[in-house]
C-alpha cells in the first residue's frame, strides 16, 4: 500500500492484474469494488468511475466473482442491501452466448445501480463500514484463489462518529498514522494477502482543505490498510 492514486490509474492497474496474468492463477478470482456515492463526489467523476467499473468487470474471465458495494453514510443500515454481485459463467455455450448474456445483464444492473445512487446521493460517507462489508464478501467466497479490493472515493470518512474534515487526529501525518493503527486494531479487519487499490475521486470536500490535512488523510488510509495486513 504505497499511495492513493487517481481512479483511472487504479482501474487500469487492476484490469492488468486480473487479465494479463490470468494463466498463472489457479481457480476463480474475486474482485470487490467499493464506490463512494455520497454527494461530495463531483457528478462527472462519479460517471467516469462507473464507466471504468463497467470496463473492468467486462474483462473478467470465466468463474471470476465480482461484488460492487456502495459507500454510503451508514454501511450496515444503507449499503448491505444494495450490494450487486456477478459471477462470470463457467459453462460455455455455443458462440459464447453465455458471456454475451452476462455482459448484457451486467450493463443493465450497473445502470440501475448508478441511477439509484446518483438520483439521491447521501450526505455522509462511511468508508470504514464499507470495508467491513468487503471483508464479509471475501469470507463468504472463501474458495477464490486470488482476491483484490478496489476503493473509489474521496477518502473523507464522515459518519455519525467520525469526520475527517474536522477531527484533530487528522491534522498531521504523524498523528494520523497512530490513529490509523488504533482504528485497524479496533475494527479488527483482516485483509492479509489481499491487495488494496485506492482510487481518488474528485470531490467538493477538498476545496479549502489545508495541505497538512490532505496529507494526513492519505497517510491514515495507507497505514490503516497496512495494519490490516494488505500486501501491496
Q: What does each model-found stretch correspond to?
A:
Residues 28-40, 110-116, 199-204:
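Acidic/histidine-rich, surface-exposed loop or edge segments in extracytoplasmic proteins
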Residues 21-23:
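Bacterial signal peptide processing site
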Residues 1-8:
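Bacterial N-terminal signal peptides that target proteins for export
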Amino acid at each position: 500500500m504505497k499511495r492513493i492514486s487517481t481512479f483511472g490509474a487504479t482501474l487500469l492497474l487492476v484490469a492488468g492484474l486480473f487479465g494479463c496474468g490470468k494463466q498463472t492463477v489457479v481457480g476463480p478470482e474475486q474482485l470487490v469494488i467499493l464506490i463512494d456515492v455520497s454527494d461530495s463526489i463531483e457528478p462527472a467523476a462519479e460517471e467516469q468511475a462507473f464507466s471504468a467499473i463497467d470496463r473492468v468487470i467486462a474483462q473478467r474471465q470465466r468463474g471470476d466473482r465480482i461484488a460492487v458495494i456502495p459507500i454510503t453514510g451508514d454501511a450496515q443500515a444503507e449499503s448491505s442491501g444494495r450490494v450487486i454481485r456477478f459471477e462470470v459463467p463457467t459453462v460455455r455455450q455455443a458462440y459464447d452466448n453465455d458471456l454475451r448474456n452476462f455482459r448484457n445483464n451486467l450493463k443493465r444492473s450497473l445502470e440501475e445501480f448508478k441511477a439509484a445512487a446518483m438520483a439521491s446521493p447521501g450526505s455522509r460517507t462511511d468508508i470504514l463500514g464499507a470495508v467491513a462489508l468487503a471483508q464479509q464478501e471475501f469470507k463468504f467466497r472463501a474458495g477464490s484463489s486470488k482476491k483484490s479490493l478496489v476503493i473509489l472515493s474521496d477518502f473523507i470518512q464522515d459518519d455519525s462518529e467520525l469526520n475527517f474534515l474536522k477531527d484533530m487526529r487528522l491534522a498531521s501525518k504523524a498523528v494520523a498514522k497512530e490513529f490509523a493503527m488504533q482504528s485497524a486494531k479496533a475494527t479488527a479487519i483482516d485483509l492479509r494477502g489481499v491487495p488494496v487499490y485506492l482510487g481518488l475521486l474528485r470531490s467538493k470536500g477538498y476545496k479549502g482543505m489545508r495541505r497538512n490535512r490532505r496529507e494526513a488523510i492519505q497517510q491514515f488510509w495507507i497505514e490503516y490498510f497496512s495494519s490490516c495486513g494488505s500486501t501491496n
